[in-house]
Every structure is written in structure tokens, then in C-alpha cells.
């Protein structure tokens, strides 16, 4: 619908009517009389050049150039920042969850600890930070402006992402346990097995960084793998950190680990690739269920007829 030459009071009624229908409403204005509508709207947009001080104080956004095209750019940037914040959280929490599950399971089973508290500090303070920061600089996703407005009442982490955090935490814990005890079965020393466990968690994280670049879509394409150079710089830094951690005698003595041979590295990298593919498989299933739920017709109630 188009409303032309409406009075300020009518602007307020339009905003209230659209909000009652469940829409997220943005309203522009520049005069004193526009203040009630700007205040009522979910996003009030005032003019920075011609707007009055009252309208600017009532609005959430001020267009410094009075150019309406700036609204679209601001929405795109805001959605990108919000998505990147979610990606950063989604990469950090499963790592912490996997570490906790590994330690709790080891304590409950009464066996050897695959990782020590000092290893957790290393992972969280060095490698996790280096990887998580890179997602804060992820570029704009191609379809971000085709997505519907986000529900203001929706939580930052929805049920789907909570499930993914739990799912990936379990995969990290299982992979760490499996590699640790497999190395012990092969006759490796406890120090070497723990070095494998620590490197496994780190490279699980590296693989999961790519999964997290797209929260719903597949990352198995050129843009998903190569679309963010900063991610690759972060991975390069993590690889250097882990080489120092694994092979420098001072770090070996400090963290109670031992150097790894080529076969150990192959096992770590192979299981990391498996984790990445398993997460992509989970995302594909989630997309299929989402499409099926959207395609299911909704019955109309008597009040809607």
C-alpha cells in the first residue's frame, strides 16, 4: 500500500497498525510533529541535515546525508555485524563445551586425562581467540538483504544454534577421546598422546571455522573456503603457534607434551576433515527440514477467515 501526503498523526496510526499485524516498522521524519511516530516505530529514522533536534532525539537512526539509500546500506551493515557476532559465539562455545565434556568424561570414567588444565588455557587464550576474531571480519553474505527482518524478541542464539553447539561439542569430545586412546593403544607415550589431543582440538576448531562462516548454507564452495582472507591469516597464525607448541623443547617441558610424527599429524587432520563434513551434513538436514516446514500449508483459523 502507498500512503501519500499523510499528516504526522496519520503516520503514528500507520506505524501502530502495521505493528499490530506483526511487522517490523521503520519510519522516517524530519519535523517536530514526526517525533511520536519515530518513537513508536521499531526503527525511527531522522534527517541529519534538515531534521529538527526533537526528531533526531526521538529516532534510533540519523541520516547524516539525508540520503534514503543510506538506510539500505545501514541495514546491510547492521545485519552483517549481528551475523558475525553470532558466528563468533558459535565458534567459541563448542570448543569450550568439547573441552568440558572431555574432562568430565575422563573424570567419570576414572581414566587418564587427555588434556590438562594448562592445555585448556593454551587453547582458549591463544588459538581460539586467533580463530574467533577472524569471523568478526567476515564479508557480507550474498543473500543477506533477501532475508526477512529479525524478530526483536528472538534470542541471540536460537534453538537450532543451541543444538549445533551441543552437537559440535560432542564431536570434539569424541574425536579428542578417540585419538588420545588410539595413540596410547599404538604404544605412544602419554606426552605424545596428549600432544595429539591438544592439536586435535585446535584443528577441529580450524575446520569448524569454515563451517561457521555460513550458519545455514553450505560452505563447500569457492566462496565459502576462500571468501575471507583474514580467516586464512588466522589459520596461518594458529599453525605457527601449534608448531612451536609441539616441537619447541621449552614448550614440551612446560606443557608436558612430546613432538608428533607425520602419521600422528595425518590422523589429526583426517579426523578434523571428518568433523567438518559431519557439521555440513547436519546443516544440510536442517535446511531440508526448514524447507519442508515452509512448504507445509498452514490451516486458517476462524478468526482469520
Question: Where do the protein language model's features map onto the residues?
Answer:
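Residue-level signature of transmembrane alpha-helical entry/exit and packing/kink sites
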Residues: 116, 164-165, 231, 264-268
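Small-residue-rich segments of transmembrane alpha-helices in multi-pass membrane proteins
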Residues: 229-237
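Cytoplasmic-side transmembrane-helix entry/capping segments in multi-pass membrane proteins
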Residues: 221-229
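Cytosolic catalytic headpiece
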Residues: 1-33, 39-43, 85, 107-110, ...
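Alpha-helical transmembrane segments of multi-pass membrane proteins
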Residues: 123-127, 200-208, 238-245, 271-279
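Membrane-embedded transport module
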Residues: 1-27, 41, 46-217
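Hydrophobic alpha-helical transmembrane segments in multi-pass integral membrane proteins
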Residues: 175-179, 237-253
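Short, Lys/Arg-enriched, Gly/Pro-containing loop segments at transmembrane-helix junctions
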Residues: 141-148, 218-222, 285-300
Amino acid at each position: 500500500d502507498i500512503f501519500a501526503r499523510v499528516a504526522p498523526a496519520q503516520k503514528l496510526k500507520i506505524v501502530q497498525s502495521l505493528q499490530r499485524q506483526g511487522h517490523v516498522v521503520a519510519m522516517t521524519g524530519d519535523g517536530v510533529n514526526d517525533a511520536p511516530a519515530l518513537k513508536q516505530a521499531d526503527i525511527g529514522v531522522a534527517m541529519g541535515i534538515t531534521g529538527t533536534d526533537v526528531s533526531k532525539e526521538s529516532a534510533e537512526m540519523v541520516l547524516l546525508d539525508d540520503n534514503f539509500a543510506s538506510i539500505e546500506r545501514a541495514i546491510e551493515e547492521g545485519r552483517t555485524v549481528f551475523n558475525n557476532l553470532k558466528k563468533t559465539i558459535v565458534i567459541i562455545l563448542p570448543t569450550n563445551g568439547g573441552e568440558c565434556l572431555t574432562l568430565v568424561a575422563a573424570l567419570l570414567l576414572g581414566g587418564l586425562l587427555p588434556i590438562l588444565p594448562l592445555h585448556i588455557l593454551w587453547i582458549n587464550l591463544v588459538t581460539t581467540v586467533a580463530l574467533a576474531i577472524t569471523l568478526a571480519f567476515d564479508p557480507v553474505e550474498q543473500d543477506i538483504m533477501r532475508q526477512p527482518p529479525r524478530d526483536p524478541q528472538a534470542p541471540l542464539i536460537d534453538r537450532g544454534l543451541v543444538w549445533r553447539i551441543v552437537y559440535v561439542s560432542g564431536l570434539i569430545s569424541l574425536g579428542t577421546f578417540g585419538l588420545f586412546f588410539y595413540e596410547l593403544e599404538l604404544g605412544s607415550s602419554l606426552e605424545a598422546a596428549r600432544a595429539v589431543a591438544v592439536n586435535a582440538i585446535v584443528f577441529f576448531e580450524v575446520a569448524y571455522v569454515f563451517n561457521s562462516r555460513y550458519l545455514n548454507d553450505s560452505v563447500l564452495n569457492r566462496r565459502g573456503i576462500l571468501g575471507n582472507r583474514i580467516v586464512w591469516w588466522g589459520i596461518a597464525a594458529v599453525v605457527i603457534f601449534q608448531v612451536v607448541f609441539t616441537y619447541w623443547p621449552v614448550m614440551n617441558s612446560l606443557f608436558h607434551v612430546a613432538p608428533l610424527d607425520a602419521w600422528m599429524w595425518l590422523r589429526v587432520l583426517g579426523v578434523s576433515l571428518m568433523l567438518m563434513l559431519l557439521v555440513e551434513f547436519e546443516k544440510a538436514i536442517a535446511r531440508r527440514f526448514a524447507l519442508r516446514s515452509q512448504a507445509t500449508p498452514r490451516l486458517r483459523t476462524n478468526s482469520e477467515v
